[in-house]
Amino acid sequence: MSFLQEVGKRRTFAIISHPDAGKTTITEKVLLFGNAIQKAGTVKGRGSNQHAKSDWMEMEKERGISVTTSVMQFPFNDCLVNLLDTPGHEDFSEDTYRTLTAVDSCLMVIDAAKGVEDRTRKLMEVTRLRDTPIVTFMNKLDREVRDPMEVLDEVESELGMACAPISWPIGCGKEFKGVYHIHRDETILYESGHGHEIQEVRTIKGLDNPELDAAVGSDLAESVREELELVMGACPEFDHELFLAGELTPVYFGTALGNFGVDHMLEGLTDWAPAPQTRQANERDVVATEDKFSGFVFKIQANMDPKHRDRIAFMRIVSGTYTQGMKMNHVRTGKNVSISDAVTFMAGDRSRAETAYAGDIIGLHNHGTIQIGDTFTQGESLKFSGIPNFAPELFRRIRLKDPLKQKQLLKGLVQLSEEGAVQVFRPLQNNDLIVGAVGVLQFDVVVARLKAEYNVEAIYEGVSVATARWVDCTDGKKMDEFQRKNQANLALDGGDNLTYIAPTMVNLNLASERFPDVQFRATREH
C-alpha cells in the first residue's frame, strides 16, 4: 500500500464525556468491533480478574476510573483507527486537555438521562479552539432517559453545534426496542443480554413496513413515525463540510452496555472523520502527507511496565513515516537520536513498531531527556504550537516521613511533573516542595505512585497558596528589580521556569499592578 493510502486510512480520535457517561464501556465495545478484544472487559464477573482493557494502573482498577490516557489501535471498515482514551474523572483535565491536541476528531458520549453535563462543556471548549469535528453518541437508552429532542436542543444551545440525527431511538428503558437508521431507511431491533459479544441483529426495511408494527407494537410504531416526521422537519440534514468545520455533529443513539448502536457510530466515524490533518508549527504549517518525518510529544507516562522503571513518551506523528532504527532530530536539545525501539499500543500490551505513519501514536522510551511538547523531525527546526500547561488551582506542601529520602522525593516529583501528573514548585527561599494540581485526585495519585515507584512515603500539609503564575519580562533590569522585591513569593517549577506563588488573588493583582512590565501567565506552552 502506498504512503498516501496509508495516511489516508488513518483515523485518530479521542472520546470525551462527563464522568460515568459510559466512556470506558464505549471504548470496550469499540475495540470489540475492531476485533481487538474478544470479550469486552467491562463485565467483571464475581472473582473474575477481567478488568476493562483500557483501565490498567492499579489505582484505576481499584476505583474504576481511567486515570491515564491509553492508546489503542485497531482496524475497522478499511480504516486504521487510533483511539485515545482520556481520563473521565473530574480531576484529570490537564492530561485530557493535552490528549485533545493530538487527535483529528472526537467522539462525544452523552448520558441521555442527564444531557449535557459540566465536564463535557469544559472539554468541548477545548475542541472548539481547534474546531475539531465531533461525532455524538447518546448513551444508556436501555434506561429511562429524557426526551431525545430536548437533549438535542441542549447540545445545540449549550455547545453551539447543530445536531443531525443519523439514527433515532424506538422507546427507552424497558421499552427500548431499537433504532431507526435514517440514512439507511431501516429499523435495527434491540435484544437485551448481548452486552459482551457482537450480536446478530434483525433489521426491518422502511418505516411503513407492517413488520415494524408486529415487532414493536402498533402504538409504538405509530408514535415513532410521528416523532420522525417532526425530527426530519426540525433537524438539519448531515452536511460533511459543516461537520469538518466543527459546526455540526452527527448523532447516534444506543446503549454501550448492551452493545447496541456502537457499530453504526463507528461506521459514521470512519466514513466521515478526517484523515490526519495539517498542523500549525511556529515556523510553518506541516502537511500530513509530506515525506519528511515530524511529530510532537503530548504526554509522558512513567512505569507502564511495573517490572521496568521506564517512562514512555507518547508521540503523535504529524507527517511522514517512522521506520525502525531511523535517525531523528530532538529539536529542543539539538541532538540527533536513533530510535529503534518505539512501541505501538493496545492498552497495556506493547509491541514494537516496525513502521508508523502520520496520524499514528508511537511510544518512545524516555530516560529523562524528553519533555511534553518536544518536537522530533528529520533535521528541520520546528516547534508545534498549542500544547499548553495550566496554572494549577490546588496546592499542598509535601513532607517526607523519612527525611533522608529528600533526593528520591525530588527525583520522583520532577519525573511526575514532566509527565504532567502534577506540577511541582521549589520556593527560592526555603527547602519546601509545593505540589500543584488541577484536581484533588491528582494528589492521591502522586502519593500512591511515589510509594509504589520510588519507595518514598510522603504526606501532605495545607499551604497558603491561592494560585501560581509563570513570570517573564523582556526588560532585564526590571526583571531583576521584580525578583529582588518578591524573593519570598518566587519559585522554580519542574522545568526550572520562574513562577510567582501568590498567597491570595489580591496579592497577585497588587504585584501585577506594581510591576506592569512583568507578564504573569496562567498558561505556558510546553
Curated annotation (Swiss-Prot):
Disulfide bonds: none annotated. It is found in: Cytoplasm. It comes from the Bacteria. InterPro entries: EF-G-like_DII, EFG_III/V, G_TR_CS, P-loop_NTPase, PrfC, RF3_C, RF3_dom_3_sf, RF3_GTP-bd. One of its GO terms (molecular function) is GTP binding. Keywords: Cytoplasm, GTP-binding, Nucleotide-binding, Protein biosynthesis. The keyword Transferase does not apply. Residues 8-277 form the tr-type G domain. GTP binds at residues 17-24, 85-89, 139-142. GO terms for biological process: regulation of translational termination. The keyword Ion transport does not apply. GO terms for cellular component: cytosol. Belongs to the TRAFAC class translation factor GTPase superfamily. Classic translation factor GTPase family. PrfC subfamily. Increases the formation of ribosomal termination complexes and stimulates activities of RF-1 and RF-2. It binds guanine nucleotides and has strong preference for UGA stop codons. It may interact directly with the ribosome. The stimulation of RF-1 and RF-2 is significantly reduced by GTP and GDP, but not by GMP. This is Peptide chain release factor 3. It comes from Aliivibrio fischeri (strain MJ11). The gene is prfC.
